[in-house]
Amino acid sequence: MAGLRRPQSGAYRRTAAAVNLLLGVFQVLLSCCRPGGAQGQAFEPLPNVVELWQAEEGELLLPTQGDSEEDMEEPSQEQSFSDKLFIGKGLHFQPSVLDFGIQFLGHPAAKLLYAYNPSRESEVVVNSVFTAARHFHVPPVHCRVIPAMGKASFRVIFLPTEEGSIESSLFINTSSHGVFSYHVSGVGTRRVSTEGSAEQLPNAYFLLPQVQSIQLSQTQAETTNTSLLRVQLECSLHNKVCQQLKSCSLGSDDALHLEMNIIVAVENSSKQPEENTQALLDHLSIVYVATDESDTSDESAVNMYVLHSGNSLIWIQDIHHFSQKNVLSLQFEPVLLSTSTTNFTKIASFTCKAGTSCDSGIMGLRKKKASPAMQACLSSPVVQGYFRTDASTAQFHIESHETATGVWSIWYRSHFDQSIVLKDVFVSKETKHILKVLSFRGPLFLPPGCWNIFSLKLAVKGIVLNLFTNVFLTTNTGAIFAIPLQIFSAPTKEGSLGFEVLAHCGMHYFMGKSKTENPNWERSLSLDRSTWDMDSELANKLYERWKKYKSGDACRRNVLGMSQFAFTKKSKETEPFVSFLPRVVPEPNLVLNFSATALRNSAVKYFVVRNPTPQPVSLQLLPLSLYPRPEAAVRLLHKWFGTDMQMVNLSTGEFQLTQACPYQGEPSEESSLGALHVHLQALETRRVGVVFTPADYGKVTSLILIRNNLTVVDMVGVEGFGAQELLKVGGRLPGAGGSLRFKVPESTLMDCHRQLKDSKQILSITKNFKVENIGPLPITVTSLKINGYNCQGYGFEVLDCHPFSLSPNTSRDISIVFTPDFTSSWVIRELTLVTAADLEFHFTLNVTLPHHMLPLCAEVVPGPSWEESFWRLTVFFVSLSLLGVILIAFQQAQYILMEFMKTRQRQNGSSSSQQNGDPVAMISSHPHKSTCKNFLDTYSPSDKGRGKSCLPVGPSLSRLQNAAKRSPATYGHSQKKHKCSFYYSKQKPSASAASSANVTTEEKQTVTLASSLSVAKEDICTNVLSENWVSLRYASGINGSLQKNLTLPKNVLHKEESSLKNTVVTNTPSECSMKEGVHTYMFPKETDSKISENVAELKEQEPCPQKTSKKPPESTLPKTPPQYLQSDLPEVSRKHGNKQQAPVRSEVDSFEPVRAADAEPSSVRKTQGASPEDTCSEKQDTPSAEQEDPSRKRKLQERREGSTQALNWNKTRPCRRNKKRASAQASSSPRPSEQSEQRLVCSDVRSWCAQDGAGEKCKAGTEVSGSSPERREEDSYYQKSEKKCADKFCSDSSSDCGSSSGSVRASRGSWGSWSSSSSDCDRRPVVDIQHFLPPGDGVSPQNFPSEASVPLSLPQHVCSSTDVSVLPEFTESPCPGLPATPAGAGEEKGLYPPGGLWPSQPVCLTSSFNCPVENGAPGVSQEPTSIPDSSFIDWSASCEGQFPSVYCPLELNDYNAFPEENMNYTNGFPCSSKVQTDFIGHSTPSTWNTPASMPAAWGHASLVNSPSYLTSTRSLSPMSGLFGSIWAPQSEVYETCCPISPATEHATHMENQVMCKEYYLGFNPFRAYMNLDIWTSTANRNANFPLSRDSSYCGNM
């Protein structure tokens, strides 16, 4: 070989990876001295991170993760610590900061640093530990393993060499987590001498000897259980340690061997000697501290320090050294080492005497020839915090030898401030068979200066070299120096064989074609169709050249990649084409084999690509699946490299490429298509990673194509295996079949028999299961869950429940405890094992218990701790609730009792006053109500037969005032509220029947009308539907003007007086006499026989003769009454439209206060001033009307003005009645309060009779015989109109219903239920017009003219007839029916508002109701009713006909639907003189004188004794009244209700029906009202009493 070729300056610069060094104090200069210059590269400082850039010829490397010696032998100049820096904090250090405190200069101190590995899965390998300052030292650490969840200790030694505070960093280089930095600090101080001056310390150096062996004495090795051990410790210090000492010169092969005899006191003599010696080594630390020559001495000293941290006592007896030359002097004294973990003890000192210089040995190694000498010079100026390399001083000089072996000596010049130890020198793996390291026999102590380190020898001959590799040097600082080395051969001269062979091969010529010579290569990088065309063309050219050169035997290549010179005379050897090609992959036939990898996980492996030529090379790396024609590429590779085409997967995408770590500032060349572009400079190496991510289970094999412009194509094989984690628990696989059984035999539960209940011991069953990893992957179980709960749930608990790891084919036992609650004999739960890869393995826990042992063992199982408290709280709260209910019930009952007592006291007080017979004594602020009460007292016993709902009549004034303060609707209703009972009387002849009150004076019609309204308040009790019912008939001379006048306001009535006089047939007093001397007495049905006798006595006192007409008079009805009504109704409707009806009703409503105001004085005067003898005289009535005082008139005017506001509201309140309550209310008996209202209405009717009927003869029976077909048409019309009117009512509040206080009457229909008054509103059929004849309170039959028709517009509270055409007027029937007005048109408005005249509740009586005539009076016609279309109503048919259970309230707008002319009062009224004066005391001359010839309508003899007709669902129990009336709400206004049905049949006698209107002041929903009447009267309990006990409601509250 002619010599070495030096690369051009700056042509082959290489960069290295970064090194993490904080506060570094080293600067490494690796110089390679060559003729022509030197190359190097500087280190750039970074805060806390120091990057080390590798130089071409010399660089500093630190071992990184997974870098073994083989890894470092790879020619990778990119391997730097920046690849692994700060990957993650994988170690925890304790203490967090290491502080040594104050230490004397030159005196070492030690402390332990503990490193913990928190990972539960992987272990951590510590490759090396080094420091950044010369004051801190760590004994050599090489590949120390820290197990998972384990710890390791490192001894850090602090040797201060300068004063002051010293802070530095300790660097721990790990295999998996990079480099960690750890802060250390200390303070150095000088030792003060006895003279008081500080000692001057020369430069000190820290040396660590190697302990070679430790031996026991022969006797102790054979003796056991000894307490003392004699140990011989042999350690060596390399001879080159003394080379720094100027006075010491040792041979190159000499070493300083020391032997220490140590006696150790053993604490535990039972241990083996080997264990004791190992413990001694672990706790014994030996260091050397060498010092330079001092000013006073030429000798250098090496002090020996020993640290013992164990518990045993150590006695150092002797120390010997074995040096071949007597150059060392030893000073030693035996010492007993104390136990300490920090301070060293100085035990010996060595002094090195003067010797020869070191330069002579070096000069002897130099060669005499002029070939370049090889020197190694390292300079290291310390710069705090970072490294810096001076390129001008970092040089390597390689000396060539003349011998064929080719040996090169490596020289090293160190400029460090302190010495370093060179531990090892090695070369990369690929060059082991080429290069050999010589002259290196172990660790070298390298003080500052220039030293011959080792030699390199080329082990091959006769080949052309083109080699680029590294030489690696390891030091005690933890740093590894990589020296780049390029070795290649060249012809010694032109024309030599080697040069010619290389030129004829033409490899460099071909490989040099890149961008300029072959531009198509760059276009083929797009991986389109042209890619394969380009690769195929270049590959064919290269192959043809190889065949050409091969046939000429010009050049051959071996498997090592180096050409061997051969002569043509030698035999030809067959070599493959691949051996001829220079490979970009250093390792031929390289296959990256990935171990088993879990799905969705990735594994990475790296390989190296290099450029073996001095020309740049461009590479494109890509998986085979991304190549345009992968099958063609595989065929080419099979042809060149012998690849197995069957095993290669052409389409797999599980392999991807990644660049290992791009250089800082250099952009990544990875393309978006998954290919990797790499540009390699001459001799450059790059590291490329392959990522394997399995997509399915199983093995997959593919190729990584390496397209290049050097050999066209190259490849790397890849192989991976997709695996899954698989566990077995208890020998069962997870899933449906993974059932882990807990079979509990009966013998296990026998303790339930012997166990006491008080002990409450918990039975549990424990079973162990083996968890096996049967898969190829390691598994880490992170959690165990039972039905979603960690470690325990539903009685199961996993003991020692913490994460654990399982390697493949390993197992572990887990214990599961089951605590049954003995509620079920079969318990099934799910055990889930969750791994670190988020995989879940499900197993079934199946427990079977003996079912017959469950009840016995369940008693032993203790309940939850909160169970007893829960039940106590439950019982406590239930008790409180029960107590509260009892208290509330007690208070309510007490309130009910108090209300009952109040009501009873009021009733008793009123009853006592009524029994005295003085009606004036009961007059209260409401005279008409008091009069109603007096009337009850007259005809009733002391308790008045009231049942459950009998309330006091007189309301309190406060209630009236409160009612007036309500809303306008309530106020309008609270103005007038009346209650009426209905009474039935039998006709008896009386002397007072001849008295006549017929006043026909035309000038007093208006006065009579006004006074009649006042008198009606007193007479209403006997007015509305009393027992003295009279017949109604229509006059034949009806005209429409009269009816219109009655419907108009008062001023209209005054204007039409003349027309009324001309139209109405007047009755003269002479003509108002009856043909028969029959007098009709009105008795309520509640009265007994004693009352009837009193009436008989009154009858004898009445002088009025009575005559009974035996022939019914002809009817005077018009021929066509339906046409008249149909024509009249629209006319009135047009006159009184929606806007005109309100004033009319308001004016009509104004009559009501007049009645209320005038009732009291008139009642008093009539009662006191009239005698029984003059009751029939009409002159007695006239002055009573004239006695009205002015104050009474003023009250009349005020009440007219005050009551108008309630009219409009009542007008718009139609009400529906619930049909279920209708029958019950229809069958309820009349009440005393209703009788009072009847009396009020009586006077009104008499007043109207006196005005309109003056001058006419009242002849009885004139209107029954006049029945005609036109009359029947009229009757049918009325029946139709009633059906049409049924749709007029709507729902309203209970105040508009026909029952009082929430329908006390309606409550009788159901036992103990609430009143249905509010729902009764839905039951009212439409009866727009109801005309009635209010019976007089003692008016004789002579008051009614027998020949004249009495026109009357009746109020709303009289039951209307269903069929008007069947109203009988004569009393030929055994018991005449009750008179009523037919239902008329629904559009007409009446005179009285709903608050004025309160209608009564209808009561249907039995058909057997008879009206006997006492004393044989001829008042009863013996002829049966032969006229079917009579004017009497069949009331029993009304009750049970078309609407048997429906109320029929009378509307305000229905009063004037029928003309008053058509109404004839043919029945006689009771002519009691005392009572008659109440009706006619102060009114105008009455026209109520009935002719003597008028037949009596109520002449049946069985009036009192006949049982009542009670049809409905009323309860007969007295308790029904209690439950039905206790909570009766107070209603405001109640409408009249009457069941309406067409009269289909007409019996020989008439059935009676009564309507009652109850009165209540107002409804207060927040107060309970109790209406009770306990039956205490014996008379009321009599079996002959006609009505039931709950039918005599009276009074209000």
Swiss-Prot record:
Record: glycosylation sites: N343, N593, N709, N846
Gene3D superfamilies hit by this protein: Immunoglobulins
Regions of this protein lying in the Extracellular compartment: 41-869
Start-end of Low complexity biased regions: 907-917, 1223-1239, 1291-1319
UniProt entry tagged with the keyword Membrane: yes
Signal peptide range in chain numbering: 1-40
Biased composition, class Basic residues, residue ranges: 1213-1222
Keywords associated with the record: Cell membrane, Cytoplasm, Endoplasmic reticulum, Glycoprotein, Membrane, Signal, Transmembrane, Transmembrane helix, Wnt signaling pathway
Membrane-spanning ranges: 870-890
Topology feature Cytoplasmic, residues: 891-1597
Bias kind Basic and acidic residues: ranges: 1269-1290
Purpose: In its membrane-associated form, antagonizes canonical Wnt signaling by triggering lysosome-dependent degradation of Wnt-activated LRP6. Regulates thymocyte proliferation.
Protein family according to the UniProt entry: Belongs to the TMEM131 family.
Designated name of the protein: Transmembrane protein 131-like
Lineage: Eukaryota, Metazoa, Chordata, Craniata, Vertebrata
